[in-house]
From Swiss-Prot:
The keyword 4Fe-4S applies. Residues 93-312 form the Radical SAM core domain. It holds the Pfam family Radical_SAM. This is Lipoyl synthase. Belongs to the radical SAM superfamily. Lipoyl synthase family. Binds 2 [4Fe-4S] clusters per subunit. One cluster is coordinated with 3 cysteines and an exchangeable S-adenosyl-L-methionine. SUPFAM superfamilies: Radical SAM enzymes. NCBIfam families: lipA, PRK05481.1, PRK12928.1. It comes from Xylella fastidiosa (strain Temecula1 / ATCC 700964). It catalyses: [[Fe-S] cluster scaffold protein carrying a second [4Fe-4S](2+) cluster] + N(6)-octanoyl-L-lysyl-[protein] + 2 oxidized [2Fe-2S]-[ferredoxin] + 2 S-adenosyl-L-methionine + 4 H(+) = [[Fe-S] cluster scaffold protein] + N(6)-[(R)-dihydrolipoyl]-L-lysyl-[protein] + 4 Fe(3+) + 2 hydrogen sulfide + 2 5'-deoxyadenosine + 2 L-methionine + 2 reduced [2Fe-2S]-[ferredoxin]. Its main location: cytoplasm. Gene3D superfamilies: Aldolase class I.
Length: 373
């Protein structure tokens, strides 16, 4: 694989000189400048890179997006697609698929890449598992991804709420395959508690994203630990060898090819089965800047590198996100099911999936994004 040419753009982390503010009230959101401006990680100005043609996103016609949003509001549900301003939201919503975000809309972390609001979360909604299960059943979803904000305020990191959601979905929609995309459950005794709880009702796919290479963690994921995330993935797999494990990384934050390849090797060495690799897009001018746009050919080369390492599936492309076409990723990895939805749109083939990662459309959506957790 040819070593990519990386533009020499200095990234300076500057100290946070914001005065301490009064404690936040539960549920109050900090986003954009309000969120990042109070983070211990601040970024000096760097040149803004022009988005290449392969980063354009198609905005489909029709009212499927609005219909799905209405159903979500009716059941008081949140999708990470909306909260994180994902660039694929129009495509996924128009196909009747979504990644549901449980445990509220406020995260206890201030990751510099993420557009989800920071603050002091409200207590978990005990009715949310039932509302989620009802929506999944009404939509006729055959595959659903459930993720959450970080909940460092909870002793189990929210693991019991995940289990309650899994159990409720299986009760209301027993044919639905369930992938969970979890936080890291970091904290004294928290991983142990979370894994014990998840053992009572494990998902069909367990996903936890390492997000970036370890050298960039202080700037990208303050409050997280690379080895902790790897350990979580390995320990879950050891407890549930029959459940596929999955992780994902973003590119464009200043990583090198050698670092990316080393991270892929680390994931495989920790028994991760599937991996996603996609381009980081800056949600707001206050977030971590994009330092490089990797080309479609480079993503293809990383896909080949990952498959040679022994992953059962590698989704690698500029617009790939952890839960983007997650049903097809799982199907290609050997998890058998009929990946169709009830809203009338045909499932997208894996060939179409790969093609869409390299085709530029005439219109671009708001390309703020998160690879999410």
């Amino acid at each position: 694989m040819t070593q990519p040419i990386i533009r020499s753009i200095p990234l300076h982390v500057v100290s946070n000189d914001h005065p301490s503010s009064s404690p936040l009230q539960p549920g109050v959101k900090q986003s954009g400048e309000d969120k990042i401006g109070r983070s211990p990680v601040q970024f000096a100005d760097v040149p803004v890179l022009r988005k290449p043609s392969w980063i354009r996103v198609r905005i489909p016609s029709g009212n499927a997006v609005q219909s799905l949003k209405a159903k979500l509001r009716e059941n008081r549900l949140v999708t990470v697609c909306e909260e994180a301003a994902c660039p694929n939201i129009h495509e996924c919503f128009s196909h009747g698929t979504a990644t549901f975000m449980i445990l509220g809309e406020v995260c206890t972390r201030r990751c510099s890449f993420c557009d989800v609001a920071h603050g002091r979360p409200k207590p978990p909604d005990p009715e949310e598992p039932i509302s989620l299960a009802r929506t999944v059943a009404e939509m006729g979803l055959k595959y659903v991804v459930v993720t959450s904000v970080d909940r460092d305020d909870l002793r189990d990191g929210g693991a019991q709420h995940f289990v309650d959601c899994i159990a409720a979905i299986r009760q209301s929609a027993p044919q639905t395959r369930i992938e969970i995309l979890t936080p890291d459950f970091r904290g004294k005794g928290r991983m142990d508690r979370a894994l014990d709880i998840l053992a009572a009702c494990p998902p069909d796919v367990f996903n936890h994203n390492v997000e970036t290479v370890p050298a960039l963690y202080p700037n990208v994921r303050p409050g997280a630990d690379y080895q902790w995330s790897l350990t979580l993935l390995k320990r879950f797999k050891a407890q549930h060898p029959q459940v596929p494990t999955k992780s994902g990384i973003m590119l464009g934050l200043g990583e090198t090819l050698d670092q990316v390849q080393a991270t892929l090797r680390d994931l495989r060495a920790h028994d991760v089965d599937m991996v996603t690799v996609g381009q980081y897009l800056q949600p707001t001018p206050h977030h971590h800047p994009v330092l490089r746009y990797w080309t479609p050919d480079e993503y293809k080369a990383l896909e080949e590198y990952g498959m040679a390492l022994g992953f059962s599936h590698v989704a690698s492309g500029p617009m790939v996100r952890s839960s983007y076409h997650a049903d097809h990723q799982a199907k290609e990895a050997g998890l058998g099911f009929n990946a169709t939805v009830s809203l009338g749109s045909p499932a997208v083939s894996s060939t179409e999936h790969r093609e869409r990662n390299t085709i530029a459309s005439k219109s671009a959506s708001k390309t703020e994004s998160i690879h999410h957790r």
